[in-house]
Structure formats: structure tokens, C-alpha cells
């Protein structure tokens, strides 16, 4: 694709989804099967309203079956499916209608709560509709009223899936065919939030009332090493802590416990619900404010404001004899902000640092932890 967007002052090239690849491949294969003629390019109108003109690759053409592929172009997005070939194989059937299924390298759903039912190929609803409409368009143009069987495959999918959330979500054997707009926008925050939503929805469908959240690998490692909990029980939120809490509320969880490094979670005390540094860095401001409320003054406060890391600030608090008091105040502030954010579910947080280990927790954290272990 040649289309671009501007993000954070950078010009970034758009791409197209695996769903667009599957629909375009199915459209091309259906056209070749029903017309008997080879087609080396295909046009596809995406749900976003953008039309794609895509090269058709690796064509196999016979009277009974046509198979071809579209190469995934992720644009400037760091997508693991970049350059992967997504295949569609189309055959005529004696029954009326279009049947869509997954083949090699397309995962199968094994747990409830996902976009597709258990046992179905992991081809999500929008890509299924895109495939259906693309094939129906060809049938209409060529006057075909019979049935067609469409199989979507991705030969590299089983290997690629090991680098995705699919194994944790209960999708086995391959990748998912995804996309709601048909277009990939580089570094899309919404795509990351959607991933969190999928995993939380799957946990809720599995019967969980309480959920453990971790912003990143530090939190997961701490959960495993210091708390003796299977890290697979935690849902990774990345920087989208506020979104994750709102999703928990929306899905009907009774409670959510957040476990993370102080460098991330201190920002919650300032009402910063997306903790990415592009939205600001208030770590030392918040810690210094908490310390000042506990009596830190003058030069020591100025020194804390200049600390490069939270561990440096904690070291200074120890020297000033304010370590416990400030952490207690910080936990209280985080508790207040989490309650303000999601007052209709139980929330809690446990903070740690790599140098000092366990630091503090909000007042409901221990109870939530027990419930998560029992859930």
C-alpha cells in the first residue's frame, strides 16, 4: 500500500489485515474457478472504505478447484504476519450457499468466550463477512447460483502462532484471521486494547469472577517468583491499565487486582491511566508530593525531584526515615484513584521494585489475591 498516516509526527505506511488477504484470495480463487481464466490481480473494498489492488500469487488452477494466495503487507506496523502468504482454496459443492472453513495454519477455537464458537476455525466475524461478500460478488457477476466451499490457510501459521496470544486464549494450531476495518494502522493502540478485551472476555466466559492484571513482564516475573502464582493466570495490560479496568467492569468481573512495578503504578496515583511515557512522566512529582506530605523538606525534596529512577527515590526515602510512611500514602492515593475509576467493582494493587521487592499494597489487595487463588 502507498497510503500513509501521521502519528507522533512520523509518516507511517498503512497495511492490510489477514482478513483482507483471506477475502481477496477467496475472491480471486472464486473468479478463476467460475470463469476458467487466470487472474493475477484482484480488487477488494475494505470495511474502512479503502479499495485494495492486490497481486495474486502461487495460483493452482483446475476445473474442480482453484487455490491462490495474497501476501500480507503490514505497512510500517511490526506485525509478525508480515509477508505471510494467506491462501484460499475454492471448490464447487452440490449444496446451495457458501461454506467457509480454516485449513493448515489457521487456528481452532478450544475455549469459550472468543469471537467464534468452540470447534470453529479462528476466522473472526468481520473477515468471515468479507470473504462471504467477496465470493457472493463474484457469483453474481458470473451468474453462478450453486454452492462453494472456501478453505483459508496459512502454511506458516502454526509457527507464527507461538509468538502470539493464541495459545493462551485457547486457539490452537495456527494464527487467527483478523481485522475489523481491513486496514492495519501502524502501532494501533486500539488493536492492543482489543487484544486485552479478547483475553478478559475469554476469562469471564470461563467462569472467572476475579482477575489478575499485570502491566508487563516485570509484573509477570514477580507473580511467578515472589508470589508463587502461575503467571499464565495474569492478563497483560501493557500501558492500558485504565482501559483494562473499564473492560473488567463492562464484562461483569467482581474484582481486579493489579500487580506491577512502582515505575508504572506510581502514575496511577496521579490519575494517569495510560502509563506510556508519551503521555507524561509524573513519577518523581508524585513521589515527592507524597514525601512532602509526610514531612520531606527543602534540599531533600529537590533531590528527590531529580532522581532518575524510583529505586533512587526509595533509597532517599530510606535515608530520610520516610520509606514506610510515603509508601503507605502512595498506596492510599492509588486506592482512591482506582475506586474513583471503577467504583462498582473491587479493585486493588500491589507494588514492587526490582531492588527492594515488595513495597506496598492497597487496602483490598490481600482479599482480592485470596479470591483470585480460589477462583
Protein language model features and the residues they cover:
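Generic N-terminal targeting/processing segments that precede catalytic cores or assembly contacts
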Residues: 1-163, 167-169, 364
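A structural signal for small-residue-enriched, beta-sheet-centric alpha/beta enzyme cores
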Residues: 3-6, 13, 169-175, 180-329, ...
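Flexible, glycine-rich phosphate/dinucleotide-binding loops
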Residues: 159, 220, 358
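N-terminal charge/polar-biased segments
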Residues: 1-18, 32, 36-39, 140-141, ...
Amino acid at each position: 500500500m502507498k497510503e500513509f498516516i501521521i502519528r507522533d509526527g512520523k509518516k507511517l505506511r498503512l497495511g492490510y489485515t489477514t482478513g483482507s488477504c483471506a477475502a481477496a484470495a477467496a475472491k480471486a480463487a472464486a473468479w478463476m474457478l467460475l470463469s476458467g481464466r487466470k487472474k493475477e490481480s484482484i480488487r477488494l473494498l475494505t470495511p474502512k472504505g479503502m479499495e485494495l489492488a492486490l497481486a495474486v500469487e502461487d495460483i493452482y488452477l483446475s476445473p474442480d478447484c482453484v487455490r491462490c494466495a495474497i501476501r500480507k503487507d503490514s505497512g510500517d506496523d511490526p506485525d509478525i504476519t508480515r509477508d505471510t502468504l494467506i491462501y484460499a482454496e475454492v471448490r464447487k459443492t452440490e449444496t446451495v450457499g457458501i461454506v467457509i472453513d480454516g485449513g493448515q495454519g489457521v487456528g481452532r477455537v478450544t475455549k469459550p468466550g472468543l469471537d467464534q464458537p468452540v470447534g470453529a476455525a479462528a476466522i473472526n466475524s468481520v473477515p468471515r463477512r468479507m470473504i462471504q461478500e467477496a465470493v457472493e460478488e463474484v457469483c453474481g457477476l458470473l451468474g453462478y447460483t450453486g454452492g462453494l466451499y472456501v478453505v483459508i490457510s496459512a502454511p506458516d501459521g502454526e509457527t507464527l502462532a507461538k509468538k502470539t496470544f493464541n495459545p493462551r486464549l485457547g486457539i490452537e494450531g495456527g494464527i487467527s484471521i483478523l481485522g475489523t476495518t481491513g486496514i492495519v494502522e501502524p502501532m494501533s493502540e486500539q488493536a492492543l486494547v482489543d487484544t486485552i478485551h479478547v483475553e478478559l472476555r475469554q476469562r469471564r466466559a470461563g467462569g472467572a469472577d476475579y482477575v489478575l492484571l499485570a502491566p508487563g513482564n516485570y509484573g509477570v516475573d514477580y507473580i511467578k517468583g515472589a508470589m508463587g502464582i502461575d503467571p499464565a493466570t495474569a492478563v497483560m495490560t501493557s500501558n492500558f491499565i485504565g482501559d483494562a479496568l473499564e473492560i473488567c467492569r463492562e464484562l461483569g468481573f467482581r474484582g481486579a487486582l493489579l500487580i506491577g512495578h512502582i515505575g508504572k503504578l506510581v502514575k496511577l496515583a496521579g490519575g494517569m491511566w495510560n502509563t506510556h511515557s508519551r503521555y507524561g512522566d509524573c513519577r518523581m512529582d508524585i513521589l515527592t508530593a507524597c514525601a512532602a506530605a509526610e514531612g520531606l523538606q527543602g534540599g531533600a525534596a529537590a533531590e528527590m525531584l531529580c532522581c532518575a529512577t524510583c529505586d533512587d527515590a526509595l533509597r532517599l526515602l530510606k535515608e530520610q526515615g520516610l520509606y514506610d510512611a510515603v509508601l503507605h500514602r502512595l498506596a492510599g492515593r492509588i486506592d482512591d484513584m482506582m475506586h474513583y475509576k471503577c467504583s462498582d467493582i473491587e479493585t486493588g494493587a500491589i507494588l514492587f521494585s526490582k531492588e527492594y521487592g515488595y513495597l506496598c499494597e492497597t487496602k483490598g489487595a490481600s482479599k482480592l489475591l485470596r479470591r483470585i487463588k480460589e477462583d
